[in-house]
Amino acid sequence: MMIEVSINKEHLKDFNRDGFITINKFIDLQYLENLKERIALLFQGEFETGIEPDEWNWRSGRDPNNVTRQICNAWKSDNLIKKVVCNPVIGETLSKLMGWQGARLIQDNVLWKPPQGKSLSYHQDASYVDWVVPQTMATCWIPLDNMLKENGTLEFAVKSHQWDLCPPSDNFHAPKDYKKELDDYLKINNKILKTSPVVIPAGGVSFHHGMTWHGSGVNQSNTDRRVIVAHCVPNDAKFHPSNSGGTGKIYRKYKLNNSDELNSSFFPLLWEK
């Protein structure tokens, strides 16, 4: 199988307590090099399906080499990436962790942080989907390279899924201080911060709650840090009647006339009971 994982009671306990879990083995390692090749082609503007992704934040020759590169909804452009992010195992696992009846993909990310690639601001994923009812999310984060503290791996604020939902970050890409918005929240609300870096091998996985604060620092290593991410919402989630904050300005265009459904042509249903 391409993807395989088994969630036990300890995983569920850890997720509910901390807002995230990490597992060392998730995706069959034979796929990693091919996925890296596909990612390189995407950023060169070569799309297997002929369809551009919804967001394409870095282009060769146009943008600085030392920023973190991002593509959103690469599943529309590449069939191998679609096979990963639309895998039923992801939907079932996130549903178990969140207590949902099922899950659908709201958006994927391909993130490529090159050597000296800059940081990504601490944020909560759910803050970007006020255009979805209910405003909740859960995320599957799959590294294609070994994740170490020095290569700018993902960091979680432990137990922060129990805090308030804050507005989206104003300075997500390459901020001067990637912890500023989190630090501001901590000071105002008198919270104590404990962070946990995701240190797992290539082909492992982390799952996190949409309320969990997370971000990543500069890649201080001399190797690339590439990740594929699947963001999911409950299977029965709908469009909010009017909200368009966060990523809504991009994704409300997929709202059908006279309907509030998240249509599976644009927001694939991954799994349901």
Where are these regions (language model features)?
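Double-stranded beta-helix
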Residues: 147-213
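Short, structured patches in soluble enzyme cores that scaffold and shape functional sites
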Residues: 107-109, 124-126, 142-146, 158
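Short, conserved beta-strand element in jelly-roll/cupin
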Residues: 131-149, 199-200, 207, 231-234
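Feature marks short, surface-exposed loop/turn motifs that line or immediately flank catalytic pockets
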Residues: 114, 148, 163, 234-236
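Short, surface-exposed loop/helix-turn segments at secondary-structure junctions
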Residues: 54, 124-125, 179-193, 224, ...
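Non-heme Fe(II)/2-oxoglutarate
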Residues: 45, 50-57, 166-171, 205-207, ...
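A short beta-loop-beta micro-motif enriched in histidine and acidic residues
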Residues: 125-137, 193-194, 200, 223-224
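Non-heme Fe(II)-dependent double-stranded beta-helix
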Residues: 2-17, 24-122, 128-131, 243, ...
